[in-house]
Amino acid sequence: MAKEVFQRTKPHMNVGTIGHVDHGKTTLTAAISIYCSKVNKDAKALKYEDIDNAPEEKARGITINARHIEYETAGMHYAHVDCPGHADYIKNMITGAAQMDAAVLLVAADSGAEPQTKEHLLLAQRMGINKIIVFLNKLDLADPELVELVEVEVLELVEKYGFPGDTPIVKGSAFGAMSNPDDPEATKCIKELLETMDNYFDLPQRDIDKPFLLAVEDVFSISGRGTVATGRIERGVIKVGQEVEIVGIRETRKTTVTGVEMFQKILEQGQAGDNVGLLLRGVDKKDIERGQVIAAIGTITPHKKFKASIYCLTKEEGGRHKPFFSGYRPQFFFRTTDVTGMVSLEGKEMVMPGDNVDIVVELISSIAMDKNVEFAVREGGRTVASGRILEILE
């Protein structure tokens, strides 16, 4: 069957659901998908099972990798990332967050904010998301007096992490909306959420004029066609027939893009902000991996050593309880990759939780790197610092 061509009739935005495990992120994503398929006859409804689609996730009932679905409202075309909330899988949340322009933070009304609520807010802020909407879920299970307290608590938390104090809160039951798609009362919260998204989120400024760059999130082999790399276009534009370079982790190599697709539809060209699959000529599945970047030729180079400014989280923010010294070896998360690196402190003996400090880092493998790129620092399954590259040393 021939694939249809993607029609760019509405502005495109990447939005995601974030929040603590079991607060209802995937249920909300499914409820939105089902609601939009009722309103817009062309849309395909995805049930909870379709979004949580790895066997291990079904068994544990949690989302591991970020999942993508698409839907349209009156004014926008959304690509929606369902981000994992489970602690071990927060690294996938980082790559999910790196693809989002705005986020919906889920908080269960019956339990309030939890540790991962804070970690996700911090990561969202570090990944450059500047507006969120709070969805207060499981309203049917919560004591009405408690709900007011949870609202106040969540807004305080949202402000603490640098988001606006007038961040909108939508209340409802995602499970109710998902289970009763034909009941207007049950789906009212979804309608309200989508209207709030259309009106409150700012359309991001896309870097279309800069040289093309996409961070590889996943790689597939399609029989008879070749290798497809997927990810979000960070900047620039890509067309079929364009020559590109695959940079980072391994030797840099050149290839030609022979196809561009988004949500199984053919794109005339992919542009900044699009989540796409690129078909690459003469590249074997084993020759390319998550964490590399595909870029316009000669526009980005791989490096190991850089100087950065970092902020170390306090114990209360879920960071380290003790200082670290030169020789500290945590994981550094850039775009879609994590690499171990060694920290050197200059003119300072140690770094305390809560400090803002400049450090020098040497990674164990080269990755595609440019100035001002932000990263997260993690150890033992938690985020301990966030930073930005000041200069590349070698």
Curated annotation (Swiss-Prot):
| Molecular functions per Gene Ontology | GTP binding; GTPase activity; translation elongation factor activity
The family database entries (Gene3D superfamilies) matched by this protein are listed as: P-loop containing nucleotide triphosphate hydrolases, Translation factors
User: Which InterPro entries does this UniProt record tie to the protein?
Assistant: EF-Tu_GTPase (IPR050055), EFTu-like_2 (IPR004161), EFTU_2 (IPR033720), G_TR_CS (IPR031157), P-loop_NTPase (IPR027417), Small_GTP-bd (IPR005225), T_Tr_GTP-bd_dom (IPR000795), Transl_B-barrel_sf (IPR009000)
Q: Which domain of life is it from?
A: Bacteria
Query: Region (G2) spans which residues?
Result: 61-65
Residues of the region (G5) are 173-175
The family database entries (Pfam families) matched by this protein are listed as:
GTP_EFTU, GTP_EFTU_D2, GTP_EFTU_D3
Tell me its EC number(s), please: 3.6.5.3
List of residues binding Mg(2+): 26
Checking CDD domains in the record gives:
EFTU_II, EFTU_III
Q: What does this protein do?
A: GTP hydrolase that promotes the GTP-dependent binding of aminoacyl-tRNA to the A-site of ribosomes during protein biosynthesis.
Recorded hits in PANTHER family, A to Z, give:
ELONGATION FACTOR TU, MITOCHONDRIAL (PTHR43721:SF22), ELONGATION FACTOR TU-RELATED (PTHR43721)
**Entry protein name:** Elongation factor Tu
Starting at the broadest rank, the lineage of the source organism is: Bacteria, Pseudomonadati, Spirochaetota, Spirochaetia, Spirochaetales
